[in-house]
Structure formats: structure tokens, C-alpha cells
UniProtKB/Swiss-Prot annotation:
EC number(s) given by UniProt: 4.2.1.59
Chief location category: cytoplasm
UniProt xrefs under Pfam families: FabA
Domain of life: Bacteria
Family statement drawn from the similarity comment of this UniProt entry: Belongs to the thioester dehydratase family. FabZ subfamily.
Keywords, sorted A to Z: Cytoplasm, Lipid A biosynthesis, Lipid biosynthesis, Lipid metabolism, Lyase
Coiled coil segments of this chain: none
Protein name: 3-hydroxyacyl-[acyl-carrier-protein] dehydratase FabZ
Catalytic reaction(s) noted: a (3R)-hydroxyacyl-[ACP] = a (2E)-enoyl-[ACP] + H2O
Listed GO biological process terms: fatty acid biosynthetic process; lipid A biosynthetic process
Length: 157
């Protein structure tokens, strides 16, 4: 328990993610978040399946998850923990602002379980920057720094 007598959120299932993120199929790219430490860090989980629509064209004979979708999954993980920790009842939207230092180290393919580690490295007003690493079976497959802004109508952030 935290000092304000509220239960500390340690994980978020798909229903919790659907409650805070505006993304839906086929663009909701995380299935669950675990190891949540406030809005500071967490681990997102993406189970990669052959049924995802991008595999029909990327690439038909050798399906590989597009790198841009791996970065988007990282950003969704960071955005979700920011929204899950909000103290107000007002809905918020997280806008992806920047991608820096993105590197892709190995392909992600159907059957992989993508672990998305995000850690806040900077906060200024309603803008946060996160260091992100994606791994499959303990091997780093991608990394990036992403920045995002929470926007809420009629709220001073």
C-alpha cells in the first residue's frame, strides 16, 4: 500500500489497457503490462501471432514484425503506465512526440513473445521521455527513446 492508502498497481491486463488507451485492433500492440513501478517503469508484453494483418505484406514468405510497430508497442507501454497512474478521473490521451536512437538488432517473428521494458528518464510538465528496450527470449531485438505528451481537455497538468 502507498501512503495515500490506495493499492499499488503492479500489473494491467487487457481490460485495463482498453480502459486507458484509445487503440483497438489492429493497432493495439500490447497485451498486458507487468512489473509496474508507478509511471517510472514497467514491462509490456506483446504476443506476436501470424494472424496479425501486417504479416500478409511484411513479408508473405518470411513474416517479420515491422520495426515501426515494435517502437509503437514501446510507446503504447509507456503511454499506458502514464495514463494508469493519473490522479484525476478525467480521460487523457497520450500523443507520441519523438523517437530517438532507434536501433533494430534482430527480426521479430510470429511465435515470439516480445517483452517491452520502459523506464522514464525525463519529465517536464506533461511531457515524458522513456528509454525503451524490446527483448525476445532474453535477447535485445530493439531499443529506442520515445517522448510523449499527455493531453487532457480543461486540465492544468
Amino acid at each position: 500500500m502507498s501512503d495515500d492508502n490506495q493499492t499499488k498497481l503492479e500489473a494491467a491486463d487487457i481490460q485495463a489497457l482498453l480502459a486507458v488507451l484509445p487503440h483497438r485492433y489492429p493497432f493495439l500492440l500490447i497485451d498486458r503490462i507487468v512489473d509496474i513501478d508507478g509511471d517510472v517503469s514497467a514491462t509490456g508484453i506483446k504476443n506476436v501471432t501470424i494472424n496479425e494483418p501486417h504479416f500478409t505484406g511484411h513479408f508473405p514468405e518470411n513474416p517479420i514484425m515491422p520495426g515501426v510497430l515494435i517502437v509503437e508497442a514501446m510507446a503504447q507501454t509507456a503511454g499506458a503506465i502514464s495514463l494508469l497512474q493519473r490522479k484525476t478521473g478525467r480521460p487523457g490521451v497520450v500523443y507520441f512526440m519523438t523517437i530517438d536512437n532507434a536501433k533494430f538488432r534482430r527480426p521479430v517473428v510470429p511465435g515470439d513473445r516480445l517483452l517491452l521494458y520502459v523506464k522514464k528518464i525525463k519529465q517536464r510538465a506533461n511531457i515524458s521521455k522513456y528509454e525503451c528496450v524490446a527483448e525476445v527470449d532474453g535477447v535485445k531485438v530493439a531499443e529506442a527513446e520515445v517522448a510523449a505528451m499527455i493531453s487532457v481537455a480543461d486540465e492544468n497538468l
